Amino acid sequence: RELAEQTRAYQQFSPRQPSNLLFDRPVNGPLSSPFGLRRFFNGEERNPHSGLDFAANRGTPIKAPAAGKVILIGDYFFNGKTVFLDHGQGLISMFCHLSEIDVQLGDEIARGGHIGKVGATGRATGPHLHWNVSLNDARVDPAIFIGAFKP
């Protein structure tokens, strides 16, 4: 059920125009895990990391990196409390492991608008924000959008 909900959200395409393509960082905090890093769990190799992790204290505010519409909210086994934001033209952000969600389904959020607070819900080893960006259902490195991409 969780995977099906999230897949539908990633496949959503709205005609709205993205408000900006250079995004703001959604949270202040150091990068703790980059995009694409190969992961291991109990000695087993897993899929590469599909987003950026930012270390931050529990309760740190999370801001919308660009304007968007809340298209999915959930509390999932792996991702914990999660918000999906549709920026338009197939560009979707996912914010995971929140301690609090401060938006509702269908809300229009301005760039810099408050989404929720950093937490460690779901499968997390400590408080952090996992931020994932998808373009037409393909995961892309969010660092590209915040001017921090390093090939």
Q: Which residues does each predicted region cover?
A:
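Catalytic cores of peptidoglycan-degrading enzymes
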Residues: 24-151
